Amino acid sequence: MIYWIFLGLAIIAEIIGTLSMKYASVSGEMTGHIVMYFMITGSYVMLSLAVKKVALGVAYALWEGIGILIITIFSVMWFGETLSPLKIAGLVTLIGGILLVKSGTRKPKQPNRHRGNRPPSVQGLKTQTTGHHKGVAVESGEHHAAA
């Protein structure tokens, strides 16, 4: 659970950092650059913590995808950017992709405990001796030099 919180914090930090970058470029104020540097750095730190338990592909898709959606909305509201029908279609497609990636994440089933901790494909196999060569057993499929 904590790793998903790290991912959420990474997304929030990325959004703030990216919007601060735009603010700094529009206003020319140094404050935007400083906020951007700290937030983008914090975003990567939180993302690196999140991927300890959240699959990298899922974490990155959510981090970028949700970030793009929210940054686009705020860019329209705060910076007067426009949303064309093609951009809207792209955002809807992005939402669908995020949902598909997230729904495809399942915890892997715990492997069954087999005797001797051998994988099932090796369990029933027994070594077969095919013959003797100067007192040395030769196993099938292997070639041993006589000593």
Swiss-Prot record:
Write out the ranges of the annotated region (Disordered). 105-147
A single Gene Ontology CC annotation of this entry is:
plasma membrane
Which SUPFAM superfamilies does the annotation name? Answer: Multidrug resistance efflux transporter EmrE
What transmembrane ranges does the database entry give?
1-21, 31-51, 54-74, 81-101
Composition bias, kind Basic residues: at what positions? 105-117
Give the location in the cell.
Answer: Cell inner membrane
Membrane-protein topology: Multi-pass membrane protein
Look up the signal peptide feature and give its range.
none
Q: What is its main location?
A: membrane
Keywords per UniProt: Cell inner membrane, Cell membrane, Membrane, Transmembrane, Transmembrane helix, Transport
An annotated Gene Ontology molecular function: spermidine transmembrane transporter activity
Task: Offer one example of a GO biological process linked to this entry.
Answer: glycine betaine transport
Name the InterPro entries for this protein.
Small_drug/metabolite_transptr, Small_multidrug_res, Spermidine_export_MdtJ
Q: Which HAMAP family match?
A: MdtJ
Chain's role: Catalyzes the excretion of spermidine.
User: What do we know about how this protein assembles, alone or with others?
Assistant: Forms a complex with MdtI.
Regarding protein family, the annotation reads:
Belongs to the drug/metabolite transporter (DMT) superfamily. Small multidrug resistance (SMR) (TC 2.A.7.1) family. MdtJ subfamily.
Query: NCBIfam families from the entry?
Result: PRK10452.1
Instruction: Identify this protein by name.
Output: Spermidine export protein MdtJ
The species this protein was found in: Yersinia pseudotuberculosis serotype O:1b (strain IP 31758)
